[in-house]
């Protein structure tokens, strides 16, 4: 009889779920960040001369490192203007790495072999939350759609610079949102929390 009780306890423990697997705290979530950047090192597959914003961005970037050059003298075939996006996980700490997505916004033919220059990633509040840079990784063929050489990723290519503040430690209460809503799950979760 003692062994049956022990076995039942082990099975119950194995099938018990953690609160974080069943629900999330309302107001605590991942946040999207976005930035505008330049990918360099393209072998003639970058933006053409019709992408004026790319040429202006190259001139601005060069000026920031004390290189004075007229936009009329810039050829942009080895550079592409891109939008850079990332997801800032809830409770991400300063210095944490995040994955980055890079997508061409000009008329570049391919981002293959390119490197993203340092790009600030901002939240919807306009504050800088991360910085991104690094060599691009292009994915393979996606289903029947074929390759998408103007979209790439940089695994762990972003570094968190600013944390999103969550004031949970001093909060007197917290509201939970069930991931798969059911009255039975809500009742069991309430009972488990109140039992502690």
Please provide the spans of the model-predicted regions.
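Mature, extracytoplasmic segments of signal peptide-bearing proteins
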Residues: 1-4, 15-196
